[in-house]
Amino acid sequence: MKRILLFHFFIFTFLHLLAQRSVENLNFQWQFAYDSLFTNAKTIDVPHDFQIEQPWVAPSADEKADNTDVAANIKSRLSARGFKEMGTGWYRKTITHTPTSNTRYLLDFEGIMLTGDVYLNGKHIGGTDYGYVGFEIDVTNLLRKGENILVVKASTQNEKASRWYTGGGLFRNVSLVSTPADIYFERHPLYITTRDNRYVTVSADYTNRTRMKQTRMKVSIYDAEGNLVAETTALRGRNPQSRTVNIKAQELEIANPKLWNLDTPYLYTCVAQLLKEDGSVADEYSEHFGIRTIEYGPDFGFKLNGKKVLLKGYANHHTLGALGAAAYPRAIEKRIQLMKQFGMNHIRTSHNPYSRQFIELCDKNGILVVDELYDKWTRQHTGSRVPFMNHFASDITEWVTRDRNSPSVGLWSLGNELQQDPNQPFNDFGVTCYKMMRPVLQRYDSTRLVTVAMHPRYRNWETDSLPCDLAMQTDIQAYNYRYMYFPGDGRRFPWMTFYQSEASTAAMGPNWFEMNLDKVIGLAYWGAIDYLGESQGWPAKGWAQGVFDISLNPKPKAYFMKSFFSDEPLVRLSVMEDKNAGVEWNGIITGTDRQSELWNRPEGSKANLVIYTNCDEVELLLNGKILGRRENPKDAKSRNKITWNGIDYKKGKIEAVGYRQGKAVARHALETTGKAVKIVAEADNSQWHADGQDLQHIRLRAVDSKGRTVLTCQDELTFTVDGDARLVAVTNGDINSHELNVTNQRQLWQGQAMVILRAGLAPSKITLTTDSKTFKTVTTKLETK
């Protein structure tokens, strides 16, 4: 693998030496303050979320729920926004510029949360009204020779500008791009399409201001090993009406193509070069892509490369737990890889475009994405600064051209739950808006279908006689939660193809097994990972109904999901602590039963057990004594879940053994633990890069003399970091905790805590020292390379 990466590095280094395009990383050494005078400014690096650092704001005694928008789930003023105060952050950076002749310069922002304004040398030069999409500003004639002062103002807007915690600031990459001034590729210029799993067509948007009578574009396709597998050159004559045009290369055939799929997500690289008259490279742009075929239909749901695939996934907001909105690639990949371990193959980007790195990591790891642009189509829910109708076209253009070449993107979603909003620009449940937006999308990509996630699926809350008008317009019928209408709607409208775009974790199991899995596309579990914002009420800082806590620790119910998302034999044992009656939210019942894996209980007490399994039957043993064997229920409401009530507690070990065809294939046990005797540290990143952005997640556990996690230990830990790295977040998974995430201490919760370190720019020996009042100091030796 190292040889392959080096080969790619040398190929593209050589090509870039020939070309004039360059990208300068501007992520480092910004000054940040909460006012434009930069009072008490501090040095930060991008990505950065200024809101995550702020204190929690508890609701005052007189704050009441706001039910004017049932979907907003507003329990108090800041409950939807994660109990963080709204505000503005100011960023300042000095850019030293040495002008080069015939060169064009662009500032490239991948996003500013939630809205942003950009100033160069005191002059307002641009910004964004919807910070989830990127933008660029041509600064060719604005940059001075020598020092230039770049200032960015980022605003969270008011608390009603979003239904969830957004974070605030420069939460994605910033760069300075330079290209030739007279002939160059435009922003996100390449459009790469494939046919019949072997043919590739490449077109590109470019500008030519030279006197050349023809423009030549050379297209080269490389496989993942760096071998050239196809090449062609396209020609286009001058266009007197427009200097910015599109050039399309002839279709290329790839011999013995390797397909992109979920298990082997093979990626090719397309390198496009605009050539000068002497054959040298004027500008160059490269992008990864995959060769694959996607199909949708009412009789089979979804096919990838001709084979039926069920989407098994989740839908969450863009934030990353204790890191807030800051889009760290390592944190994103950690999530993706964990979800794959639990049988997932799909993520819906609710309800906005995630970072470009997220999409690229889904390409790399074999995840299918429903790529979503908006929540509701109103000013309030799309930045709140300007009318929605003023910016949707530019948002769509940026979003689609950025992601259209990624094989992981299988479906476009233009919005979410919009038809219930009374403030729509047109009073027809979104149909007019959709009909205006869809042609803009298809102008830039016609290879994928388009949907909108609908809830309720009907015209209003009072009737469910027919699907809403918008469901008659979309290519795919995406219903949030209302999977029970798939059969009836399918009979009345046999052309419909169904996707459960949000599924409740409270109804987990039945909302999978009760669907006709032969015909549906699949589902995405809403809030499968706990997140900040959309709190059901203080002290919870956010959504707590996930099957993974906010630090990514799996809850027992995560294994229930895995039992039907994966074929791997599984049995998982937990204790039902109490049953959550659930609460109504957004027209559905939500909530999760409180379960634990604690087997330290009062003598003489009784325990009710839940066993999740995909085995035929399960045997239960207490200290080696067989308590019985039970079959896996076959009905949809109880399948893969066995309850065992009234077990007399005895200290020791209780174990569940799963059987298939009479053979033991899986087992899981809970044990009575002893007193915690030490803290152990486990780092997750063996290839920690000194790139200024890579992360190291270190999980700390309190263990007994046998190395078992002591779930009842709640000691406070204090952390010190030495070397070229710094602590950027701490967490323990407790959504109710009042502790801050950006600090150097954390109390254990369920015997665990996690520290997240950010690498510096120089390779370094790193030491994390963990102290507490109870345990010996733990020294963790790490290294960045």
Segment roles from a protein language model:
Residues 139, 247-260, 642-649, 741-761:
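Short, hydrophobic beta-strand segments
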Residues 24, 28, 33-35, 81, ...:
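Accessory beta-strand-rich segments of carbohydrate-active enzymes
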Residues 54-96, 101-109, 113-120, 126-129, ...:
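Active-site-adjacent substrate/metal-binding segments within catalytic domains
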Residues 145, 205-297, 644, 650-651, ...:
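Extended acidic/polar, glycine-enriched regions
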Residues 20-108, 162-170, 573-582, 593, ...:
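Extended carbohydrate-recognition surfaces in non-catalytic/accessory domains of CAZymes
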Residues 24-39, 86, 159-160, 183, ...:
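Substrate-binding clefts and catalytic carboxylate motifs of secreted carbohydrate-active enzymes
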Residues 1-21:
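Bacterial Sec-dependent N-terminal signal peptides
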Residues 213-218, 261-268, 606-608, 613-616, ...:
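Short flexible loop/turn segments that cap and initiate beta-strands
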